[in-house]
Amino acid sequence: MNAFALIPFAVFAVFYVTLGVVARDFYRVPMTVAFLVAIASALFLGKGKKFSEKIEILAKGMGNQDIMLMCLIFILAGAFAAVAKASGAVDSAVILARVAIPDSFMVAGLFLVSSLISLAVGTSCGTIAAVAPIAMAFAGPLGLSPALLAGAIVSGAMFGDNLSMISDTTIAATRTQGVDMRDKFIANVALAVPAAMVALFIYLVAGSSQTGVETIPAGAAASFKDFVLILPYVLVLLLALLGMNVVIVLLLGTVLAALLGVAFGPLNFWGALETAGKGTLDMSETLTIALLSGGLFKLVKESGGIEWLTYAIARKVRGPKSCELGAFFLTGLVNLFTANNTVAIVIAGPVVRELGKKFKADPVKLAGIIDIAGCFIQGIIPYGAQILIATGVARSAGYEFSGFGLVSCTYYPFLLALSAFAGILLSSLRKSPEAGK
């Protein structure tokens, strides 16, 4: 155990936040540079290992399987967003959406769609990768804030990630606490649904108050061509709902968008290739952040930082309620460092289970709490996969905003955390017969 191993995370936070406040614009502070500064501090502060060994640890963290899969999703999401836009699918989607959905409900509607898809498929990253390109299509034409649209998508994705029976976080939370998924679902619904309803209302109000300049008038008539050009979006959503791997989903969507773009004139063969290539390059900053964050976490973990954090929180627990609060903070802090809620639950879960047995805390409550803590932090950290995918897709569509700019529009995770605290402090969660076992 080594508390000093956590210093690089403090270096990252101080560097990024301080310069962002000084500049009054977080987008002016490259997050990649902040991570490089933090990694440099980790390499020079660590003791007991040769510098070459630390570099190897850094490389292993950057090359982690989960990080590589995340990067592949970033690349494909960038290609799909760029090709779909160039093919004319964006304008067609906007024209058809305005026929079926009032403009004032567009943001709230995307929150609902994202929630339902994530609940069905159990993956927030896959949901955001599938829905974000569609959401960005509505920003300019309807005069809506792209950050608000992205925030609604991320919020909905985290709702499903927390509740879905097939979500990695649900599986990890229930297995580490030894409880049934159904019991955990019931406990979580009591907290998640009220938070989601408040978020829906906020997005409805926020979407109704948008006063941007529309580039596609409300009276634009839909044509047969519009129905054809939106097929890539339809295909991506349907395949995502069917549970197909997100890599295959995005590949098929990109190919179909390119074929339709060539067939209906906006693109030719070489133009489609060039557009796809540019879309992938637009994700370069997102890819770099993912790689660097993976390497930094590996350095900190190997130096004993995560182990010390677990010990420090566990020794503060004195009873059932403090056990529940400790479970929330332990999972949340580990997630803050790992930038992966499933990994955070797997790391914190066994410790939480032992504390629960010792202080007779309800394991069903604990399973719900650690899942909520993971989803809360994962939905608001600007270097997490969900925020990175959303900002990357937005950048591919021509919209620039910082991760913090997006987080300020991601309301649901904050509401979910507040709901969880209320549940803990007021003991409003259903009492499980397994408590104290």
Predicted segments with their positions:
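Hydrophobic transmembrane alpha-helices of multi-pass small-molecule transporters
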Residues: 1-75, 188-289, 425, 429-437
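Juxtamembrane and boundary regions of transmembrane helices in multi-pass small-molecule transporters
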Residues: 26, 155-158, 162-221, 379-380, ...
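Core transmembrane alpha-helical segments of multi-pass membrane transporters/permeases
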Residues: 32, 44, 55-88, 104, ...
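Juxtamembrane helix-boundary/capping and inter-helix hinge elements in multi-pass membrane proteins
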Residues: 48-51, 63-67, 86, 143-147, ...
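Membrane-interfacial loop-to-helix junctions in multi-pass transporters
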Residues: 64-70, 95-113, 139-149, 223-231, ...
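Hydrophobic alpha-helical transmembrane segments of multi-pass integral membrane proteins
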Residues: 71-80, 101-134, 314-354, 358-359, ...
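Alpha-helical transmembrane segments of multi-pass membrane proteins
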Residues: 104-117, 143-160, 322-335, 359-380, ...
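Re-entrant/interfacial helical elements at transmembrane boundaries that shape
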Residues: 126-138, 154, 165-179, 309-310, ...
